[in-house]
Swiss-Prot record:
Gene: ndk
Root EC class: transferase
Catalytic function, reaction form: a 2'-deoxyribonucleoside 5'-diphosphate + ATP = a 2'-deoxyribonucleoside 5'-triphosphate + ADP; a ribonucleoside 5'-diphosphate + ATP = a ribonucleoside 5'-triphosphate + ADP
Name this protein carries in UniProt: Nucleoside diphosphate kinase
Alphabetical list of InterPro entries matching this protein: NDK-like_dom (IPR034907), NDK-like_dom_sf (IPR036850), Nucleoside_diP_kinase (IPR001564), Nucleoside_diP_kinase_AS (IPR023005)
Gene Ontology molecular function: any one: ATP binding
SMART domains: NDK
Amino acid sequence: MAIERTLSIIKPDAVAKNVIGKIYSRFESNGLKVIAARMTWLSEQEAGQFYSVHKERPFFKDLVSFMTSGPVMIQALEGENAIAKNRELMGATDPKKADAGTIRADFAESIDANAVHGSDAPETAAVEIAFFFPGMNTYAGR
């Protein structure tokens, strides 16, 4: 099993519901350690830059608007197979399709306000962690 790092964002809808601690508890009880964290209110520029991969998609403006609608909690997580484990804990993007007991099934309202973001691959995890935690060593296991 590989020790990995992944980026997680608790989105404005979940922050507003005051469930950060409940989500952190799920990370920790599933072997994911929070190794860096910060709460911030993203600017349009930051959100647009972070989600630039979606720039040409029809939902881009709504995504940026949503991600700047309130504070977010951003954390780097570390653990065995952290990327896949976090994605399993999050559940399907659409909370209506998410398995019971997942973060999105329990705390998300819609496919747009879906509570959390998580990196989808080692390459994106490294880029995403560096975006929010510049200078942080993103090589797992050091």
